[in-house]
């Protein structure tokens, strides 16, 4: 079967974990890994897996995009460089899946709004953040039952799973996640907090979601909605679990989650990376299926719907 060829930018924790997932994909074929350090472990690992590599950043990839048929690129670098990376690749008709908190394209949380983006012919979609991917489905599960006036999420991840890129982008993480809690989750006001826990052995990713509903919460409907949404997320992140809740206290609905990774590249405690890379891969697969079916054509700076 034909596969859509992909490039990965950023051979760090997220880029490397994503590479393993793309290797299993029925519709995506990773062919390039882009970095900036010739001695990086991630580039060496990509070469071992048969990918072409460059240590000259995106500029090292551009001359090969057309020849190697690259149609989708994943950016797992940093919010600071993403806009330029996206501009250069969009011009060549490459669809960009943004795994940084840059958020220049629309937010995408697969179980909530992935289908909308595929039908709009976007050239850049943003995967929010790991905390956003884990918690926004829960905010959306409450807000689809009744209006949420405030949504707050707290993502706790092990220090070991947060590489230099994540640490550089902490402020962007909180801003981008809070924005997506509102735009995708449906809360009128959103707030996001990230905690890096240095405990050894490293702790699994844990997330807490608090929603304040405008009227008294319909406990049965909200509980059913949350359980249905958990099942949707588990389709691509099997280690996504409801640990406690929903707990109702007046108008507050609290949900406690745990995310265990598949252990593709980093150990299973790094569910924060896993949910991000799984969501990115799921999103790209959805676009790839549309391209393969002839319903979507990528051109310079635009995606044309059939």
Swiss-Prot record:
Domain of life: Bacteria
SS bond partners: none
InterPro entries the UniProt entry points to: Acetaldehyde_dehydrogenase (IPR003361), Acetylaldehyde_DH_C (IPR015426), NAD(P)-bd_dom_sf (IPR036291), Semialdehyde_DH_NAD-bd (IPR000534)
Annotated keywords: Aromatic hydrocarbons catabolism, NAD, Oxidoreductase
Entry-linked SUPFAM superfamilies: Glyceraldehyde-3-phosphate dehydrogenase-like, C-terminal domain, NAD(P)-binding Rossmann-fold domains
One of the protein's GO biological processes: catabolic process
Keyword NAD: yes
HAMAP family, per the entry: Ac_ald_DH_ac
GO molecular function: acetaldehyde dehydrogenase (acetylating) activity; NAD binding
Residues involved in NAD(+) binding: 161-169, 272
Organism: Azoarcus sp. (strain BH72)
Protein name from the UniProt record: Acetaldehyde dehydrogenase 2/3
CDD domains xrefs: ALDH_C
Reactions this protein catalyses: acetaldehyde + NAD(+) + CoA = acetyl-CoA + NADH + H(+)
Enzyme class: oxidoreductase
Entry EC number(s): 1.2.1.10
A Pfam family of this chain: AcetDehyd-dimer
Annotated catalytic residues: 130 (acyl-thioester intermediate)
Family: Belongs to the acetaldehyde dehydrogenase family.
